[in-house]
Amino acid sequence: MQRCAGFLFLSLILCAALSETFGLVLSAKEKRGWTLNSAGYLLGPHAVDNHRSFNDKHGFTGKREIQPEEDIKAGNIGRPLADENIVRTVVEFLTYLHLKEAGALDNLPSPEETNES
């Protein structure tokens, strides 16, 4: 019985070694390289849209519209509006903290008091 088990074990090791040398490994095939779809998913639409090789196809816009050249050069792809909103929010918050620290907010009526009158 031990002799059969040893022979079986030895034959399995030999088969595994031979299959690796001939490239017949049972593992899954490796995925190589990036496709446009995977790069767009991982990097976002702005990274793919601004890639130079994709913008060279000026005749074919496909699903996405190409931004005008002035917007790309100036960097105005919808970010200034968001940046202005962020800056405004930060300034309002800092003003609130300054007024709270100065005690100016303690004298203001609460919203319930203004609704009652």
UniProtKB/Swiss-Prot annotation:
State which residues form the propeptide.
Answer: 20-30
Q: What PROSITE patterns does its record include?
A: GALANIN
Subcellular localization, as worded in the UniProt entry: Secreted
* GO annotation terms (biological process): nervous system development; parental behavior; positive regulation of cortisol secretion; positive regulation of timing of catagen; positive regulation of transcription by RNA polymerase II; protein kinase A signaling
This protein's UniProt keywords: Amidation, Cleavage on pair of basic residues, Hormone, Neuropeptide, Secreted, Signal
Q: Which domain of life is it from?
A: Eukaryota
Q: What is its main location?
A: secreted
Q: Which Pfam families match?
A: Galanin (PF01296), GMAP (PF06540)
Signal peptide stretch: 1-19
Gene Ontology terms: cellular component? extracellular space; neuronal cell body; secretory granule
A single GO molecular function term of this UniProt record: galanin receptor activity
Function (record text):
Endocrine hormone of the central and peripheral nervous systems that binds and activates the G protein-coupled receptors GALR1, GALR2, and GALR3. This small neuropeptide may regulate diverse physiologic functions including contraction of smooth muscle of the gastrointestinal and genitourinary tract, growth hormone and insulin release and adrenal secretion.
The record's similarity note reads: Belongs to the galanin family.
- PANTHER family in alphabetical order: GALANIN (PTHR16839), GALANIN PEPTIDES (PTHR16839:SF1)
What name does UniProt use for this protein? Galanin peptides
